[in-house]
């Protein structure tokens, strides 16, 4: 299979790329910086500003994609009144509307997609005072992906809501619980274990203390 991982140049996205490459997939990753990894093909892509034209151009240049993994995220904490227009747009573009444009372009080009894997967060279902825009974006892509499972052109959808992981995502963010966060390689393994099966839609939560996987919905 050919797997495209958006936000795959670091963190969980790169850990997933390693898992899929080891399983024999041809893996293409997007990101802002090229990863030090010889098992992927890298496509530079910055989703933070006006992503639609860049996504259309990229998809047109790619081979047919069997599996889309959307693992892109951008985080800024603060009350809604604390955040600038630019910060709000960046979070929504990267963590939200980028997925919409990728799905539109892939389905327009290919007519179908075998698998969609969407990485959200516990912020998909847990409201947090200092994460209103992040809550909005993660809940939005979770429900959008659920709707994609109702589109007959998409064969299988897996939505994954993990707790925080020890990645560069938290660089520059003051946290006192980094030592309690999940290991990204372990999370990637759980995603691959949850992928097989006869379903159209599955939603799993990957939680910590203790580290575990909960199946929240399946049909």
Name every feature range the model reports, one short phrase each.
Residues 115-153, 164:
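Catalytic loop of short-chain dehydrogenase/reductase
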Residues 69, 98-106, 110, 144-145:
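Hydrophobic positions on the long internal alpha-helix
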Residues 9-18:
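N-terminal Rossmann NAD(P)H-binding glycine-rich loop of SDR-like oxidoreductase domains
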Residues 155, 159-160, 175-219:
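C-terminal helical subdomain
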Residues 38-52:
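Rossmann-fold cofactor-recognition segment
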Residues 74, 81-101, 141:
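Catalytic Tyr-X3-Lys loop
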Residues 23-38:
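Conserved glycine-rich Rossmann-like NAD(P)H-binding loop of the short-chain dehydrogenase/reductase
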Residues 6, 65-73, 95, 118, ...:
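Rossmann-fold scaffold of SDR-type NAD(P)-dependent oxidoreductases
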């Amino acid at each position: 299979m050919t797997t495209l991982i958006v936000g795959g140049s670091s963190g969980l996205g790169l850990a997933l790329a390693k898992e899929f490459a080891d399983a024999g997939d041809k893996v293409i990753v997007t990101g802002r910086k090229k990863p030090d990894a010889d098992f992927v093909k890298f496509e530079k892509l910055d989703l933070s500003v006006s992503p639609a034209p860049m996504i259309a151009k990229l998809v047109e240049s790619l081979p047919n994609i069997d599996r889309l993994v959307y693992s892109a995220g951008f985080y800024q904490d603060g009350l809604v009144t604390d955040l600038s227009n630019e910060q709000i747009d960046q979070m929504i573009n990267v963590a939200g509307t980028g997925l919409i444009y990728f799905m539109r372009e892939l389905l327009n080009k290919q007519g179908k997609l075998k698998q969609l894997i969407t990485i959200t967060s516990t912020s998909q279902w847990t409201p947090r005072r200092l994460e209103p825009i992040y809550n909005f974006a993660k809940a939005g892509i979770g429900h959008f992906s659920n709707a994609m499972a109702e589109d007959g052109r998409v064969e299988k959808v897996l939505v994954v809501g993990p707790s925080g992981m020890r990645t560069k995502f938290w660089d520059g963010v003051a946290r006192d619980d980094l030592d309690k966060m999940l290991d990204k390689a372990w999370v990637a393994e759980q995603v691959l274990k949850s992928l097989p099966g006869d379903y159209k839609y599955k939603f799993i939560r990957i939680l910590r203390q203790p580290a575990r996987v909960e199946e929240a919905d399946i049909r």
